[in-house]
Amino acid sequence: QPLSETEFGELDDFLANEANEDRSMDVSTLEGFLTAIAIGPRMVPPSDWLPWVWDMEGGEVEADFASEAQASRIMSLILRHYNNVIHTFNTDPASFEPIFWRGIQWGAAEWSEGFITGFMFNEDAWSLLSMGQPTWFTPFLRLGTDEGIDITKSAGDAETWMNGIEPALVRIHAY
């Protein structure tokens, strides 16, 4: 079952709290990351990728949960969203809609940065695809890297690249 807006807000509040905000992903980054993990060329167990949710720089710092109940709730939301991404791509990939289309609080740049992080996390497995089909990755690079953002701002074509994300994801998943 997809997360509700309230559940996305709850997850975002946790990730943005003072104890986590400097190093953890926000919800948009998280979804991009989970999407790359979900559609990537090989399965990655949650135990390998979850530390990166809390510590984008090195995957070494643990989340700061106030209680066991909070830990259980947040983990449940993340894994449910991850499973929903997997389900969507396995049943109807064209219906996937990145969270950044739901509101301005969810950024396409952050989403793309998360996707790139997921890509880099599993770089060896992705390398053949990215070398063989580099244009499939252009939307993420134009929106999710400092150099790409500079080029995109200068060209004024962010919406073009945002619109290119879903078709690129469908092609990557089909590969």
What role is predicted for each listed range?
Residues 1-112, 116-175:
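Domain-length accessory/inserted modules outside core catalytic folds
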